[in-house]
Amino acid sequence: MDWLAKYWWILVLVFLVGVLLNVIKDLKRIDHKKFLANKPELPPHRDFNDKWDDEDDWPKKDQSKK
């Protein structure tokens, strides 16, 4: 088991290469053109910033200075 203490990093590299090869293989199976042709419509984006628009603390440009 002395070799394992010395060369543990080689096992980690072999594992990472295996993961990388599996990721590449799986990504090759994805048909991006088919997905883009059939992608669902996104609902309109709802943000709630309009609630704070009335509470604006900045002075209005139209008001004259007092």
UniProtKB/Swiss-Prot annotation:
Transmembrane segments: 4-24
UniProt GO cellular component terms: plasma membrane
Ranges in a coiled coil: none
Alphabetical UniProt keywords: Cell membrane, Membrane, Transmembrane, Transmembrane helix
Classification via InterPro entries: UPF0370
Pfam families with a match to the protein in the record: UPF0370 (PF13980)
Protein's UniProt keywords contain Transmembrane: yes
UniProt membrane topology term: Single-pass membrane protein
Biased composition (Basic and acidic residues): 42-51
Annotated localization: Cell membrane
Ranges for region Disordered: 39-66
Membership in a protein family: Belongs to the UPF0370 family.
Designated name of the protein: UPF0370 protein YpfN
Species per Swiss-Prot/TrEMBL record: Salmonella arizonae (strain ATCC BAA-731 / CDC346-86 / RSK2980)
